[in-house]
């Protein structure tokens, strides 16, 4: 078996076809991101979002930290898969994108997401000082 599995178009189609359907709000985020031109590349793919959802559902994940949220597609996707007592903290420094993400979370009636809008290094220090622990950390920030 190869050490690496390439994500071909056929494999990605299979993943999408055999995963949960996107919600209307997830679709709205994707459509909105299309209007952002080159910045759309900051969004994870549908298959990546569905992989994260599967990972959360199968691993008893209750507490997620996301570093870098863009317009909220990944955070919303993960939050939708969390149990009722789950929570997600999303860190991003971009005020404009964070406001847009919040509007999508509100539209989806998703209350498991807490946003912290400031540089991630500052937020991470505060979370460490507060002795916060997470089951899953998704790093999708500017690299």
Residues covered by each model-derived region:
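A short alpha-helical cap/connector motif
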Residues: 1-136, 143
């Amino acid at each position: 078996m190869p050490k690496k599995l390439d994500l071909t178009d056929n494999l990605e189609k299979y993943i999408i076809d055999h995963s949960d359907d996107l919600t209307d709000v997830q679709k709205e985020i994707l459509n909105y991101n299309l209007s952002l031109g080159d910045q759309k590349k900051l969004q994870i793919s549908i298959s990546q979002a569905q992989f994260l959802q599967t990972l959360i559902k199968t691993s008893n994940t209750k507490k997620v930290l996301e570093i870098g949220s863009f317009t909220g597609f990944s955070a919303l996707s993960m939050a939708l898969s969390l149990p009722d007592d789950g929570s997600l903290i999303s860190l991003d420094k971009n005020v404009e994108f964070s406001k847009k993400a919040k509007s999508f979370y509100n539209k989806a009636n998703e209350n498991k997401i807490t946003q912290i809008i400031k540089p991630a290094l500052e937020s991470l220090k505060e979370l460490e000082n507060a002795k916060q622990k997470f089951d899953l950390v998704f790093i999708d920030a500017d690299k």
